[in-house]
Regions:
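Short active-site neighborhood of thiol/selenol oxidoreductases, capturing the structured segment around
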Residues: 161-186, 192, 206
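Thiol/disulfide oxidoreductase modules built on the thioredoxin-like
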Residues: 238-244, 248-292
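N-proximal helix/coil linker or "cap" segments that precede and/or mark the start of modular domains
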Residues: 108-155, 166-169, 300-303
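TPR/TPR-like alpha-solenoid signature
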Residues: 13, 47-50, 93, 100
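Flexible helix-coil transition and linker loops at the boundaries of alpha-helical arrays
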Residues: 2-5, 36-45, 76-92
């Protein structure tokens, strides 16, 4: 899920996505054209327009997808001449979507390294904005699997003491990045509980990194200490089946792992190599074979 403050404009985007799902790219484009005629290239229109590009990409029309990506990027940049990026919650969504679209077009054309270089340049440009995690997510999707696991900050545990990833070498680790407001995360909880029941004795460990968002229930602003207490309460009540699971409270983890989507799941093998990087929910049926494969590798040799 995306945070409530970053949710896309519901009606227009929903209609465009429905047209895409029906395979009607012309209808999706017509909806955006009509909204543009009425309102101009507003951030809302640009978010919807990015979905037209994503629909074209899914349909294999790379030229159209690329053209929409460039148009959305240019129009978002034009809006930035009159406002800050985060002055409007929809503007970073539109700009981020255009960058993501252009990178995915490059990948579809076989230019993976060029896509990574492009994403890194954009991340360098927008590193101190709300887009940074989304850009890091896209970099990770293209490059993280098969590489050593990035460090995990463990200085602020919530409840149980936090082991470092290095201390867990020899076990298979499933990182469950979650948020206190995230209903999809709560639905993921029973899946993880079932996996721990099945594979915990064989060497599976779950760690649940999270972060502060500056508010608690109902969007009420909260001081860091108050939000930490609220997060602990949500964890205790909504994830009772995962009692004893270490919880790391640190925004740096979400930034490093590109967690603009919650839940995000990262599976690490016994040697500390990432075997899965997956923004979004996964079923037990999808996760179990991956966990079994990682467990079957056996522990690394002792030195």
């Amino acid at each position: 899920m995306t945070p409530p403050s970053q949710a896309p404009p519901a009606d227009l985007v929903k209609a465009v996505r429905a047209a895409n799902a029906a395979g009607d790219g012309e209808e999706a484009a017509a909806l955006v054209d009509e909204a543009r005629a009425d309102n101009g290239p507003t951030p809302t229109v640009l978010v919807a327009q990015s979905w037209v590009g994503r629909g074209a990409l899914a349909a294999g029309d790379l030229d159209k997808a690329e053209a929409v990506g460039h148009q959305t990027y240019a129009e978002a940049q034009a809006l930035l001449r009159t406002r800050g990026l985060d002055d409007d919650a929809e503007l970073p969504l539109a700009l981020g979507a255009s960058i993501e679209l252009l990178a995915n077009v490059a990948v579809a054309r076989g230019a993976r390294s060029e896509a990574l270089a492009y994403l890194q340049r954009e991340l360098d440009t927008w590193a101190d904005t709300s887009m940074a995690m989304r850009l890091q997510k896209n970099i990770n999707l293209l490059s993280l699997t098969g590489t050593p696991t990035p460090p995990l900050a463990t200085e602020e545990p919530l409840g149980e003491p936090l082991p470092t990833l290095a201390a867990l070498r020899g076990r298979v680790v499933l990182l469950f990045f979650w948020a206190h407001w995230c209903s999809d995360c709560k639905r993921q909880g029973p899946v993880l509980e079932a996996l721990v029941d099945r594979y915990g004795a064989d060497g599976l460990t779950v760690i649940a990194p999270t972060r502060r968002y500056g508010y608690v229930a109902g969007g009420q602003d909260a001081a860091p200490a108050d939000e930490a207490r609220y997060i602990e309460e949500v964890w205790r009540e909504a994830y009772a089946g995962l009692a004893g699971t270490p919880v790391a409270l640190d925004e740096a983890n979400h930034a490093r792992y590109g967690v603009s989507t919650t839940p995000t799941l990262v599976l690490v093998d016994r040697e500390g190599i990432v075997r899965l990087y997956h923004p979004g929910q996964m079923t037990e049926e999808a996760l179990a074979p991956l966990v079994e494969q990682a467990l079957a590798q056996g522990p690394p040799p002792t030195k």
